[in-house]
C-alpha cells in the first residue's frame, strides 16, 4: 500500500525491453533508505518490485504490457519520475 505522497523525483537511466519483459533502471537516493531487494517502489504510480540496488539507484523488472498501458510508456532516458516507497506493514 502507498500513501500517494511522492518522496523523491528520480531519473530514468534506461528501459531495456526484450520481448514481453524488461528492466527499468532509475537513479534515486532517498527512496533507497531502508529499501531491500523484493520491496515495492511506485514509479509514476506504477508499483514495481526492486530487483537490484546500487548506491545511487535501483532496477525493477517491468512487463511490456505495463509500459504500454501506463505513464512508463512515455519515459525516456533522463525522464523524471515520481518515486514512493510502500508503507510499512
Question: Predicted regions span which residues?
Answer:
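Conserved loop->alpha-helix
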Residues: 1-89
